[in-house]
Amino acid sequence: MPVARKPLWLDFRVKGFHPDPETNQPILVLEEAQGRFLLPIWIGMPEAGAIAAHLGGHTLPRPMTHDLTHALVTRMGGQVVRLDVRDIVDGTFHADLIVRDPSGREHVVDCRPSDGVALALRFDARIRVSANVMNRGAPILVDEPRPETMAIRAVAVDDWTARAKLGVALEETDPDAFGKFTA
């Protein structure tokens, strides 16, 4: 009988954003902890705004969805301990938030990676990506000179331009519009 192997995980952190050159949709760029790989994940503007606001230390006058979720989990004595980006199905990334309750029991909650990153940042939680995702998710080797990845790599390594573009887009968006988006 074959021995079941534990999945291999790599630690990642948020590197920055890059707008898709064709659609202007935000691309969240995750960087492997040792700086060897970048993993681009296309996300929605509301999630990009939530991540960017937190990274920039901005507090909005009213709590947004991720702030509310953080407050609920915290006030109930829980803690998000990590985000596991575990799979890609039909080009869509799938992830799990691992939430520890006050008794120490861990609960696995299915989520989109973008929401998971927004919450992991608020809890200072670990972000991991499975080897399965790395094998199927088109990671970018930092030193690999492929023309189709040069724009993402350039912004990820020095993402001031992308931050400025995202900042302008967010400044031009009415804050009330974030409540009108539907999934």
Can you annotate each of these PLM segments?
Residues P2-A183:
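Divalent-cation
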